């Protein structure tokens, strides 16, 4: 204990709890594997594509691929061969 220790701002328990919660949330997100928005993104892409092309529900695939330091969003759309209109 130094002479000037009383001048330092002490961390509150709320700050400590907030920091711990942020660490826990970051760990949970990294263990889950993918972001929460991928299924929603896949549904919305399917809806937009269906406005212009008649495709199946399974025709749109959305995956998150980790490539070293980068995350790559891989979107694959299987289009029909004929000129179908919805």
UniProtKB/Swiss-Prot annotation:
<dbReference type="Pfam" id="PF03776">
    <property type="entry name" value="MinE"/>
</dbReference>
<keyword id="KW-0132">Cell division</keyword>
<dbReference type="InterPro" id="IPR036707">
    <property type="entry name" value="MinE_sf"/>
</dbReference>
<comment type="function">
    <text>Prevents the cell division inhibition by proteins MinC and MinD at internal division sites while permitting inhibition at polar sites. This ensures cell division at the proper site by restricting the formation of a division septum at the midpoint of the long axis of the cell.</text>
</comment>
<dbReference type="InterPro" id="IPR005527">
    <property type="entry name" value="MinE"/>
</dbReference>
<comment type="similarity">
    <text>Belongs to the MinE family.</text>
</comment>
<keyword id="KW-0131">Cell cycle</keyword>
<dbReference type="GO" id="GO:0032955">
    <property type="term" value="P:regulation of division septum assembly"/>
</dbReference>
<protein>
    <recommendedName>
        <fullName>Cell division topological specificity factor</fullName>
    </recommendedName>
</protein>
<dbReference type="GO" id="GO:0051301">
    <property type="term" value="P:cell division"/>
</dbReference>
């Amino acid at each position: 204990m130094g002479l000037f220790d009383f001048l330092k701002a002490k961390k509150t328990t709320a700050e400590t709890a907030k920091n711990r919660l942020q660490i826990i949330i970051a760990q949970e997100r990294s263990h889950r594997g993918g972001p929460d928005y991928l299924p929603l993104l896949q549904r919305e892409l399917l809806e937009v594509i269906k406005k212009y092309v008649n495709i199946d529900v399974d025709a749109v695939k959305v995956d998150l691929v980790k490539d070293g330091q980068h995350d790559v969003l891989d979107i694959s759309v299987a289009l029909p061969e004929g000129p179908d209109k919805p």
